[in-house]
UniProtKB/Swiss-Prot annotation:
Natural source organism: Aquifex aeolicus (strain VF5)
Membrane topology listed for this record: Single-pass membrane protein
Keywords of the record: Membrane, Transmembrane, Transmembrane helix
TM spans (from-to): 3-20
Key word Amino-acid biosynthesis present: no
GO cellular component terms, A-Z: plasma membrane
One GO BP annotation of this record: protein secretion
Protein name: Uncharacterized protein aq_2054
Subcellular location: Membrane
Domain of life: Bacteria
Pfam families membership: TamB (PF04357)
C-alpha cells in the first residue's frame, strides 16, 4: 500500500512539472475519482483536443488494481481531423513480441474511431490477458451497416504469439484462423466461407476459400484456393469454378494480388490488383458464354466473349472491352465488340457493333446528368423474352432536363412464343411526357397520341392473324378505340370473325364490347355469336351470348338451338349461380350450381354415344375453403350390344392432400362379359400420389399401377385373350382367333410406351380365306411413333404386313403376299390364290392412297350379279385414291349359271372413289355354256371395260358354236350391253329362220352373259315367217318371247284356227320349262250383241282350265 501511494505521488510530481503545462495548451481536461483505500479508480475522464492531429476522449469506470487489473466499463473515442502526410517508406523488420508482466480483465470496452473516410466502432466484451493468454469477444461495425462478430484465443510465450483460434462471422462471410507469429517470421492458416447470395436474377452458392499466409518480415506472402459450386445468372450456371490467388504484402507499404479462375465450360478469368500504393485492378476473360439462359429468354442465342478491362481506384476510372467472333442469334452468326468507359465523376461512353449479313450498332455518351445516344439496325435478329424478330431501322435519343426520342423500326419474320408474326413497322416520337406512335402489323394498324397520363388511340384490324404450330388466331376485320386519363380507361370495339384454332378445337365469334374504368369502378358490356367445333364435330353452333358487368354484378347469358348458358355473380356479395347445357345427338353435358364466397356446389350430367348407345355419368362437385369433393354416382347401361356397370368414383382434396376411391367397372359386349376393373383406393398429395394396384380381368388380364410424382405414371402388363375376344366380336369381324398377346404399357409424364406380341402362334379362321392360318403379331406404340407387324402363314403361302406412323395422323402400310387363299361370298364365291405387294398411305386421316400389284389364279362361282341401284352420290368422309394393277398368271375358272369358262384378266383400277376410272381386259379362252337347253362351246372371246374422264363403255365379242341335228351352228355376239347384236351361220348352210328355230327349240337357263337375251330378241325378226305360215295353212300365227320370274327367257308360238264365226281351235308351244306355256284348247262366242264367251285349255301336264266371260255396257 505504501509503495502504491509513493508511486502515485511520484507520477503526479512528474506530471505537474513537465506535462501539465504542455497539455494545458492543448485543451487538456482530466477528471480522476480515486479511492486510495480500496485501490479503485471509480471514474477516469480524459479529453485531449488537437493532440498530434487527434481529438482523444477516454472514460473508464471501476478500475480495480489487484493481482488482476479489472476494468468494468470503458469508452474510447479517437477522431482524426488532419490529413496524413505521406510518410517515408518504413520497413518493419521485426515485431516487438514479449511477455507482458501484468494481468488484465475488461468487462465492456466501446472504441470509436473516425476520420474523413468514415466511422468505425469496436465493442470488446469479456476480454482478459492472464499469464500472457489472451481471450475475448468483439463486435465491429461501420456506417455502411457492415457488422463483424469475432472471438480470439491467443498466447504470448517469450517472442512467439500463438493464435489458437480467431473466429470471424458476418452477413457475408465467416472465417476461422490459426497461426504462429515470431518476431520476423510466422505462418497463418485461414478457412473462409463466403455465404450464399440470392438475388432476383443472381445466385452465388456458399464458397470455400483456404488461405495460407507466410510471414518473412517485412513481407507477408499470400496463397489461397477457392471453389464456387454454383454461380447462376438467371437460368445459366457458371459454377464449378476453381480459382487461386497469390500475393504479397509489405507492411504499411505495398499490397499486390494476382489470380485466375476457370470452370468446366472453359471460361477463364485472370486479374492483377495493385492495392497499395497504385490502387489499380486489371483483368481479362476468355470464353465467357452468354446464351438464352443467361438472358432469361426462350429463343436461341449464344456467344463466347473475350476481353479485358481495368479499374483505377485513384483516378476513379473504369474501362471494359469485350469481343466475340461467333454471336449466334436465332439462325445467324455475328462478329462484334463492346467498349465501355466511365469515370466516377459522371462522364463515360458505351459503344457496340455487331455485324455480318446484318448489323446492329450504337453509341451512348454519358455526361454527368445528361445522356445522348443513337442506334441503328439492319436485318438484325433481336430476342426479348418470348419475342424474336429481324429488326431494321434507326433512332436517336437524349436526356437532360427532359427525355426525347425518335425511332423508326421495322420487324420482319417475327415470332411470339409459338406464333409467327406478320411484318411490323413503327414510327415513335417521345418528348418529355408526350408520345406519338404509329404501328403497322400486316394490313392492320394502330395509332396513339398524348401525354402518358392522357392518351387517346385506335386500332384498325384487317385480316389480322397469328399463326402457330397447330394453332392460330385470326380476325378478319375489326376496330378498337381507347382513351386513358389518369386511372380512367374507356374503350369500345367491334371484332368480326375472331377465330381461334387450337389443335382439335376451333372457335369463331363476332364480338362487340364497351369497357369503362373509373377509379375502381369497372363497367363492361359485350355481345356476340360463337361457334365451336371439336375434332370437326360441332359443339356450339350459332351460340348467341351477352355479358354485362355493372355495379359489381356480372351477368352472362347465351343460347342456341341445342345449348344454353346462364351465369349471375354478385361481386360485392361474392355469391352467384350458374347453369349450362349442351344436348347433341352424339354427346351432351349439363351443369348447374351456386357460388357463395369461395365455395362452389354443382351437379353435372353427361353422356357420350358409343356403339349406338349412350354412356352416361352423373355426379357433383363441392368446394369449401381448402376442400374439394368430386363424386361420380353409380350408373349402368343395358343396350343392344354394349352393357356396362360403373360403381362410382369419389375424389377428396384438402389443401394438397388427395384421396380417391374408385369402386370398379364391369363391361359386357353382346351380353358377354368383356372386362372387369377391380375397385382401388389412392392416397397422397397433389405432387405425389399413388393407387393400390388395379386388377383387370376378362379379355384383358393384368395389373395396372397408377401414380403421380410431378407427372402421371401408369404401368400395366398382362395378356390379351384373343380367343375370348373373338367370342365377343368374331361375328362382326367374320373371323375367329385362338391365342393370346402379351402386352406391356408404361406412361410417364410425356413418355408413352405400349408393346404387344405373341410368343405362341395365333390361329385365325376367317371367312375371307378358305383355309385357317397361323400368325405372329408385334405392336409398338410410343408418344410419337406407331408400328405394327403381322405375319401370316398358310399351307403354301404367306402374308407379311407392316404399318408405321410418326405422328398418328399420317400412316404407311406395306404388305406382300404369295399364294394367298382368298375366299369371296355374297353372290360371288371364289377360291383365289393371289401373289403381290401393295402400299397404303394415309395423310392426316383425310386422304388415303392405295397402290397394289397382284397376280390372280383360282376358281370363281357367280350365282348372280348384284343389281345396280340408283342412289344419290354420297361424299366420303375421306378422299380415297386407288391405283390397282391386276392380271392372271394361269387363269381363272369361272362358273356361271349357264356354264363354265376359262378366263384371263389384265386390268387397272385408278382414280378417286366413289367413281374411279378403270381399264379391264377379259379373255374367255374356252368354256361350255347352255342356252335354250342346248350346249354352246366358247372359243376365244373378249370383254373390254373402260371408264375414263369423258368416256365409259363395255364392249364384248363372244364366239360360240353348237351342234343340232347334224348341223354345226356358229354365233358371234358382239357390241355393248345397251346395243348388242348377233351374227350366226351353219354348216351345212341353213336359213336364218331355220337356225333360230333350232337354237330355241329347248328351254332357256338363267344366264350372266347376254347370249340368251340376244337370241330371244332376235325372234322379233321372224315377222315375215308368220305371214308365210298363215297363208299356207289358213291359220292365225302369233310368235313372241317370255321372261319368267326366275329370269328364264323362251320363245312362244301360238296357232289359231277359226271354224265358223263363233268357234275356234288353238295350239301353243314354248321353249320354256313352265308346263302352262304349252297347251291346246277351244273357244265358243255367242252370236248377236250379247258378249258372252266360253273357253277351255288342256295343258301339257294334263291339267284343265275353264273360263266363262260376260261383258255388258251400262249407260248411266
Amino acid at each position: 500500500m505504501r509503495f502504491f501511494l509513493t508511486f502515485l505521488l511520484f507520477l503526479f510530481t512528474l506530471f505537474s512539472l513537465f506535462v501539465y503545462d504542455f497539455l494545458r495548451k492543448k485543451n487538456f481536461y482530466l477528471d480522476l475519482d480515486l479511492d486510495i483505500r480500496t485501490r479503485t479508480v471509480k471514474e477516469l475522464i480524459l479529453n485531449l483536443e488537437r493532440f498530434f492531429g487527434l481529438n482523444l476522449y477516454l472514460n473508464f469506470k471501476d478500475i480495480k488494481f489487484e493481482k488482476i487489473i479489472k476494468i468494468e466499463k470503458g469508452k474510447v473515442v479517437v477522431v482524426s481531423f488532419k490529413k496524413r502526410k505521406k510518410k517515408k517508406k518504413f520497413l518493419l523488420k521485426n515485431i516487438p513480441i514479449r511477455e507482458i508482466p501484468i494481468n488484465l480483465k475488461i468487462g465492456h470496452l466501446d472504441v470509436w474511431t473516425g476520420n474523413e473516410g468514415g466511422v468505425n466502432r469496436v465493442i470488446v466484451k469479456d476480454a482478459s490477458l492472464i499469464n500472457n493468454e489472451l481471450e475475448g469477444e468483439f463486435l465491429y461495425t461501420n456506417l455502411r451497416s457492415f457488422t463483424l462478430n469475432g472471438s480470439i484465443k491467443a498466447k504470448i510465450q517469450r517472442d512467439t504469439l500463438t493464435l489458437k483460434d480467431l473466429l470471424l462471422d458476418s452477413e457475408y462471410f465467416s472465417a476461422k484462423t490459426k497461426g504462429e507469429i515470431k518476431r520476423n517470421t510466422g505462418e497463418i492458416l485461414a478457412e473462409v466461407e463466403i455465404k450464399e447470395i440470392r438475388k432476383e436474377n443472381f445466385t452465388l452458392s456458399g464458397t470455400k476459400i483456404n488461405a495460407k499466409g507466410t510471414i518473412n518480415l517485412p513481407v507477408l506472402d499470400i496463397n489461397a484456393k477457392a471453389f464456387v459450386k454454383d454461380l447462376i445468372v438467371r437460368n445459366k450456371n457458371y459454377g464449378s469454378i476453381e480459382g487461386i490467388v497469390k500475393g504479397n504484402y509489405e507492411l504499411f507499404d505495398k499490397l499486390f494480388l494476382k489470380g485466375e479462375a476457370v470452370n468446366p465450360e472453359g471460361t477463364k478469368i485472370k486479374f492483377t490488383y495493385d492495392v497499395i500504393p497504385e490502387g489499380l485492378l486489371t483483368f481479362s476473360f476468355e470464353n465467357l458464354v452468354v446464351d438464352k439462359n443467361t438472358l432469361g429468354i426462350n429463343r436461341e442465342i449464344r456467344g463466347e466473349f473475350h476481353g479485358n478491362g481495368k479499374v483505377d481506384f485513384k483516378k476513379m476510372f473504369v474501362k471494359v472491352n469485350a469481343f466475340t467472333e461467333n454471336l449466334e442469334v436465332i439462325d445467324k452468326k455475328f462478329k462484334g465488340d463492346v467498349l465501355f468507359s466511365y469515370n466516377f465523376s459522371g462522364n463515360g461512353s458505351l459503344n457496340f457493333e455487331f455485324k455480318n449479313s446484318g448489323y446492329a450498332k450504337g453509341n451512348l455518351i454519358i455526361n454527368k446528368n445528361k445522356l445522348e445516344g443513337e442506334f441503328s439496325f439492319n436485318d438484325f435478329p433481336v430476342v426479348f423474352q418470348d419475342f424474336n424478330a429481324y429488326l431494321s431501322g434507326e433512332g436517336k435519343f437524349k436526356k437532360g432536363k427532359i427525355f426525347e426520342m425518335e425511332a423508326k423500326i421495322f420487324a420482319n419474320n417475327g415470332q411470339f412464343r409459338d406464333f409467327s408474326l406478320q411484318r411490323i413497322s413503327s414510327d415513335v416520337k417521345i418528348r418529355d411526357k408526350e408520345i406519338e406512335a404509329l404501328v403497322y402489323y400486316g394490313n392492320s394498324f394502330g395509332f396513339v397520341k398524348g401525354k402518358f397520363d392522357n392518351l387517346k388511340g385506335f386500332i384498325q384490324l384487317n385480316n389480322f392473324s397469328l399463326e402457330g404450330k397447330e394453332k392460330s388466331i385470326k380476325i378478319s376485320h375489326g376496330s378498337i378505340e381507347f382513351s386513358i386519363q389518369g386511372k380512367s380507361i374507356n374503350s369500345k370495339g367491334k371484332l368480326g370473325d375472331l377465330a381461334l384454332n387450337l389443335s382439335n378445337i376451333y372457335a369463331k365469334t363476332e364480338l362487340e364490347f364497351n369497357f369503362n374504368k373509373k377509379n375502381e369502378k369497372i363497367t363492361l358490356e359485350g355481345n356476340g355469336i360463337l361457334n365451336v367445333r371439336f375434332k370437326e364435330k360441332s359443339v356450339l353452333e350459332n351460340f348467341k351470348y351477352s355479358l354485362l358487368l355493372l355495379d359489381n354484378n356480372l351477368r352472362i347469358f347465351g343460347a342456341s338451338k341445342d345449348s344454353i348458358l346462364r351465369v349471375v355473380y354478385y361481386i360485392s356479395g361474392r355469391s352467384g349461380e350458374f347453369y349450362g347445357k349442351i344436348d347433341k345427338k352424339e354427346f351432351g353435358i349439363s351443369l348447374n350450381g351456386e357460388i357463395k364466397n369461395k365455395d362452389v356446389k354443382a351437379n353435372f350430367e353427361a353422356f357420350y354415344a358409343l356403339l349406338r348407345e349412350k354412356i352416361k355419368i352423373k355426379g357433383k362437385i363441392e368446394t369449401k375453403e381448402d376442400q374439394v369433393k368430386i363424386s361420380l354416382f353409380p350408373t349402368q347401361l343395358r343396350g343392344k350390344r354394349f352393357n356396362y356397370r360403373f360403381n362410382g368414383l369419389n375424389v377428396f382434396l384438402e389443401k394438397e392432400n388427395l384421396s380417391v376411391e374408385f369402386k370398379g367397372l364391369d363391361v359386357s359386349l353382346l351380353d358377354k362379359k368383356l372386362l372387369s376393373i377391380s375397385p382401388s383406393k389412392g392416397v397422397g398429395t397433389t405432387k405425389n400420389f399413388s393407387f393400390e394396384p388395379v386388377k383387370i380381368t376378362g379379355v384383358l388380364n393384368g395389373v395396372l399401377n397408377i401414380a403421380y410424382k410431378g407427372n402421371l405414371y401408369l404401368k400395366s402388363s398382362g395378356t390379351l385373350n384373343l380367343t375370348l375376344l373373338s367370342k365377343h366380336i368374331g361375328s362382326l369381324m367374320k373371323s375367329q382367333m385362338f391365342g393370346k398377346l402379351d402386352y406391356e404399357f408404361v406412361f410417364d409424364g410425356n413418355e408413352l410406351k405400349f408393346l404387344a406380341r405373341n410368343d405362341e402362334p395365333v390361329r385365325i379362321n376367317s371367312l375371307y380365306f378358305y383355309e385357317p392360318f397361323g400368325s405372329a403379331m408385334n405392336l409398338e406404340l410410343r408418344k410419337d411413333f406407331f408400328a405394327f407387324a403381322l405375319t401370316g402363314w398358310f399351307r403354301e403361302g404367306f402374308l407379311n404386313a407392316y404399318a408405321i406412323s410418326k405422328n398418328f395422323r399420317d400412316f404407311e402400310v406395306e404388305f406382300v403376299y404369295k399364294n394367298l387363299p382368298v375366299k369371296l361370298k355374297d353372290g360371288i364365291r371364289a377360291r383365289i390364290e393371289a401373289d403381290g405387294k401393295g402400299k397404303v398411305v394415309v395423310k392426316n386421316f383425310k386422304e388415303i392412297f392405295l397402290t397394289l400389284d397382284t397376280l390372280l389364279d383360282g376358281y370363281v362361282k357367280v350365282k348372280k350379279l348384284p343389281e345396280k341401284k340408283e342412289e344419290e352420290k354420297k361424299t366420303l368422309p375421306v378422299e380415297i385414291t386407288l391405283d390397282i394393277n391386276f392380271k392372271t398368271e394361269n387363269g381363272l375358272i369361272v362358273k356361271l349359271p349357264e356354264g363354265r369358262v376359262y378366263t384371263a384378266l389384265n386390268g387397272r383400277i385408278y382414280g378417286k372413289l366413289p367413281e374411279p376410272y378403270y381399264e379391264i381386259d377379259v379373255v374367255l379362252k374356252s368354256g361350255r355354256l347352255e342356252y335354250f337347253g342346248r350346249k354352246f362351246f366358247v372359243k376365244r372371246s373378249t370383254v373390254k371395260l373402260l371408264k375414263e374422264k369423258d368416256k365409259e363403255l363395255t364392249e364384248f365379242d363372244f364366239y360360240l358354236n353348237t351342234v343340232s341335228d347334224g348341223y354345226k351352228i356358229f354365233l358371234l355376239v358382239h357390241g355393248t350391253p345397251e346395243n348388242p347384236s348377233v351374227y350366226y351361220f351353219s354348216e351345212p348352210p341353213l336359213s336364218r329362220e331355220q337356225i333360230l328355230f333350232k337354237l330355241i327349240s329347248g328351254g332357256v337357263n338363267e344366264g350372266i352373259l347376254p347370249v340368251g337375251t340376244v337370241l330371244a330378241n332376235e325372234l322379233k325378226a321372224l315377222g315375215y315367217v308368220k305371214g308365210t305360215i298363215e297363208r299356207l295353212f289358213d291359220v292365225n300365227v302369233e310368235i313372241g318371247i317370255k321372261t319368267s320370274s326366275t329370269g328364264e327367257v323362251g320363245a312362244l308360238v301360238k296357232l289359231k284356227k277359226k271354224l265358223g264365226s263363233y268357234f275356234s281351235l288353238y295350239y301353243q308351244t314354248a321353249s320354256t320349262k313352265d308346263k302352262k306355256d304349252t297347251f291346246w284348247g277351244a273357244e265358243v262366242r255367242s252370236p248377236g250383241s250379247l258378249d258372252l264367251g266360253f273357253s277351255f285349255n288342256v295343258y301339257s301336264d294334263n291339267t284343265r282350265e275353264y273360263k266363262l266371260r260376260y261383258v255388258r255396257e251400262f249407260d248411266f
